[in-house]
Structure formats: C-alpha cells, structure tokens
C-alpha cells in the first residue's frame, strides 16, 4: 500500500446563521514525500458566496491562499447566481492540513408553500497534488493528471495528480432561512394603508395649522 492510498479528506461546517466556516481536513498519513504541494478544488453552489475582500484580509492575517475561478457578486440572490470554482492552496504541516474557508448564505426567494428553510449542499472538494521534483507526471488508475494554476498568483499552469479514491462522504448542508411568500400581499396592503393614513394626517395638519400667504404655506 502506497502513501497515496492512506490519504483521507473530511469536511465540516462550523458556526451558525448566514455566516459559516467551511473546514476541510486532509490527513496524508506516513510516508508522504518532502516538498509536497496541495490544492483543494471546491465547486460551490449558487446558494452561498465568498467575500473576496474578506479573503484579502484573511490572507494578510492568517496566510490563507485562495484563488477564485470568477468574480463573485456579493449582492446577487441565489436564483440569479451560478455555482463557482474556488481553489485553496493550504499549507501542509506534519502530514495534516486544515483549510478554513469563510462562506456566506445568499438571499433566497420567499416560499409560497410554507417552507421555512432551503437546504444548500456542499460536496467534498477534489484533492490534487504535485511536487517541484516531479514535473513529468504519468497518469495511472485510479489517479489522473489535470492542469491547474501552479500557485495562487495564477501566472502559470502546472500538471497535478488528482486523487480519485478518497473516502466517500455525504455532502455537508446548510439551512438557509426563507421568507413566507404568503405574507407578501398582506404586508404590501398594510404598508400602503399606513402610508395613505400618514399622508391624510399630514395633509390635515398642514391645512389646519398652516398660514397661507400669496399661495404659499408657512408652518
């Protein structure tokens, strides 16, 4: 059994509410080579987003290295957004790496069927590996060769070895609160009624207490 066969990847979500941490842990076990570089490839669903400005701050504070596959609209609701690619370049420490990625729930359409939460599932990321000493990789089952940016700076493309046999884990899920769509009409009607009532009261107050001079009103 080679050290590649002992690699395991697990993922969990910490914190509550709309703002969570997606924590991925990779355990390589004994025998992994020196100079091993790792890349986690997340394909995240449209129901969540990542704040690139927060990532820039975390890079300075913690050294977190993240490359987004495309620009992320922080304000867009879930139904107008698309899934997106996130490349995480974590640091390996004594055969174990842990990458903590801050994620945020998007606004979802209100439910007309009384549904209170929308379940957003996040699948396990792909794990790909490379070393500077091995530049000519050979594909052999169950592993395959893929191309990806060499570093987070995205200046060049390298060959990586994608690990295929990872332990199966069910997707982790988030419950995103939904608004009650059945309340839209009553709320709109109530808002309109209150607005009209305020206009009537304000107009009556101006009419009763205003001083009319040459077609002008002085309060």
Question: Which residue stretches match the model-derived regions?
Answer:
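C-terminal single-pass membrane-anchor helix
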Residues: 165-219
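Non-cytosolic ectodomains/luminal loops of secretory-pathway membrane proteins
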Residues: 1-169
